[in-house]
Amino acid sequence: MQRDLTVDEFLNYLYINVKELFTLKEKSFHFWRNSLISCSKTKNFLFVVVGDEVLVYDLKEISSDASEPEPCFYLHCPHEASSSRQGDINQDMPNVINNVRCELIGDLEYFITANDCGKVAIYDVQKLNREPIIYDVQHSAWGLAVSPLRILGISSNSHNVNLFHLSPEFKRFKEDYHSPWFRQETLVLEGHEHNIPCITFNSSGTLLLSGSIDRSLQIWDITSLSCLCKFYTKLSIWGVKFIDKNAFYHISILKHKPGSLIPAQQFGQSPWKPPIMSSSAFLLSHEEDFDDDAVFEGEYYVHIQDELPKTKVKNYFRTYLRQKPEELFIFTTKFSIVLCAYMGNSQIFPLVSSKNCFEEPITPRFQALHRINMIECIPELQSVVCASQSGQLTLLRLICTTKILNGNPIYVYSFVPHKIRLTHLVDAPLLGMSVCPLYPGEENPFKRFKIMLTVYTGKVISVEVQLSENLYDTSHIGNIPL
């Protein structure tokens, strides 16, 4: 006899180990940034931001007793502060870094920093002693993304997204009058009405998704520089991430009650209220007055049912599509995580949402800092990792299935949230999150990854995640013998 897979069985295929690596003492960290930690994908380097400086650690040199290691390298601010350029968060500290990322561009890896006066620095990870390439977007820079086409996207408090071409062929594009790059150093995507904390490219590099404090998402065509679709929510957007359809794990379902799935519908075609036009209006707005994107709840809502260990994975499927989506993506607000499908033709369909997929903050005072502004995808684990500034972490297991309805195929996508317990280690707000292979630069047949976190008190925490190979035994999926 066979039965459907339970959530406990599905999540137990993940091995998770949380530990403190070390604590940085007597360091001055800054609130209200995007992410202040990044780990290399090709070398054992860990980059930790302290103000306008980056400390580089060799992970091989970190001892097991959690003692503070010596940095193997320092990246000092490559430009002097100017009285004519002020920071948005702290006017007297314009060079404080807001966000950092390690990105592969072609065969090389680069470490990228974005600061509060709009300067963006790009370092060669293999040659950190070289002077970085500097770009300037004139306003506080936040979102960073690099496309497979070697386009660097930078979102900022200018309410725009700037694009820079990193390809060696840029000079040729710049001289081609048929190219949008003809005589241009940067291309600009205009359309948001407030600051843009997050951007992401799709896997082909042809689309860019941006999320703004003005409560809107926009999908852009990078070739035509046009907005293909605009989608409104009730709350400011703090995180966005395109997800490759191949990153979803296919679940075979033995039985499913008719009517337990509903057709996905379009929402967000018009603003919920007038857009926020100024920073002061944003600070005075009462986002808690909204039921946090309640339009995506009800049949769309995924509950974490800790008290029901025998819950079936199939119960996490909520909606279906009649056609394969062109793209899938996740966006986050203060409390909610929403999975959406982009169908082309200016159509976005929310598929499933959740806002109880984090453990409670260690102290209620951290609740004011709650915003889910850190998202990383781990396709090899069929997972997305989300972190909130208030000190919580969750791992979303991506799932999909196909069925036949009235003789036609339907396509179903969802996620199973998995809380990662941090309260025994996280005693202050999170300032950054990064994901890389457990052993960077080496083959990874056992699918072992580490999630690196930095905390306001200076703690650096490692969360090792490994997927059991047993999950790939088809006898476990929808065919578990009783």
Curated annotation (Swiss-Prot):
SMART domains: WD40
Subcellular location: Cytoplasm; Nucleus
Listed GO CC annotations: cytoplasm; cytosol; nucleus
Pfam families: CRT10 (PF08728), WD40 (PF00400)
Protein name: Uncharacterized WD repeat-containing protein C27B12.05
Biological process (GO), any one: nonfunctional rRNA decay
Keywords recorded for this protein, A-Z: Cytoplasm, Nucleus, Repeat, WD repeat
Extent of the WD repeats: 92-133, 191-230
InterPro entries in the cross-refs: Coatomer_complex_subunit, Crt10, WD40/YVTN_repeat-like_dom_sf, WD40_repeat_CS, WD40_repeat_dom_sf, WD40_rpt
Domain of life according to the entry: Eukaryota
Organism per entry: Schizosaccharomyces pombe (strain 972 / ATCC 24843) (Fission yeast)
